[in-house]
Amino acid sequence: MVKVIASSVRKGNVLDVDGKLYVVLTAQNFHPGKGTPVTQVDMRRIVDGVKVSERWRTTEQVERAFVEDVSFQFLYEDGEGFHFMNPSSYDQVVVDVDTMGDDKAYLQEGMSCILSMHEGIALALQLPRHVTLEIMETEPVVKGQTASSSYKPAILSNGVRAMVPPHINAGTRVVIATEDNSYVERAKD
C-alpha cells in the first residue's frame, strides 16, 4: 500500500479504505471560495460491487493499493463476460460486466487496453485516450445558426451520443475522447 494525497486520486485507481478495496469511478477536486479544497470520489467496492461516495480534504492521505497495470488485447464478448488476452504470455482473462462499467461501449475487437490487476483479478479497465468511430446519425445544420461556435448532437457507431461540430455529417469517421465522449477531430484515414 502506498499513501498518496487525495487530490492525486484518479479514475481507475484502487484504494484501500478501512481494509476494503475500492475502484475509483470518478474523482473531482473542488476549490470553494471559502473553506478548504476537497476531493469528491465515487468508488465501487470490489468484493460486492456496492457504490460509495467519499469526500476528503485534498491534502488528506489515502492508501492506494498495489495494482499492476498489464497490457491486454480485447478479443470478444459473450455471456461469460469480456475476454482479453495478454499478448506476451497469451493468457486469457474474463472480465465481468460490472467491472467494465460504461467503458464497454468503446471496446473494439483487437483493441489494446490496460487492465489493472490485483492478485490475478481484473479490477479496472483503461481504454486508449482516443478512438475512431463513425457518425451514424446527426441533425442537419440550419443556415444562419453558425454565427457562434455551436455543436450538434450525433449518435456514434457504438450507440454513444456525442456533440460534434456543424460540418460533420452522418457517415464521417471522427476521433472521440473516451474519457468524456468529446469530439477531438475528423479521422485522418
Curated annotation (Swiss-Prot):
GO cellular component: cytoplasm
Matching Pfam families: EFP (PF01132), EFP_N (PF08207), Elong-fact-P_C (PF09285)
Source superkingdom: Bacteria
Predominant subcellular localization, coarse grouping: cytoplasm
One function term, GO molecular function aspect: translation elongation factor activity
Keyword annotations from UniProtKB, A to Z: Cytoplasm, Elongation factor, Protein biosynthesis
Pathway: Protein biosynthesis; polypeptide chain elongation
GO biological process terms, semicolon-separated: peptide biosynthetic process
Annotated InterPro entries: Elong-fact-P_C (IPR015365), NA-bd_OB-fold (IPR012340), Rib_uL2_dom2 (IPR014722), Transl_elong_fac_P/YeiP (IPR020599), Transl_elong_KOW-like (IPR013185), Transl_elong_P/YeiP_cen (IPR001059), Transl_elongation_fac_P (IPR011768), Translation_prot_SH3-like_sf (IPR008991)
Compartment(s) of residence: Cytoplasm
Function: Involved in peptide bond synthesis. Stimulates efficient translation and peptide-bond synthesis on native or reconstituted 70S ribosomes in vitro. Probably functions indirectly by altering the affinity of the ribosome for aminoacyl-tRNA, thus increasing their reactivity as acceptors for peptidyl transferase.
Cited HAMAP family: EF_P
Family: Belongs to the elongation factor P family.
Protein name (record): Elongation factor P
Lineage of producing organism: Bacteria, Pseudomonadati, Pseudomonadota, Alphaproteobacteria, Hyphomicrobiales
Gene: efp
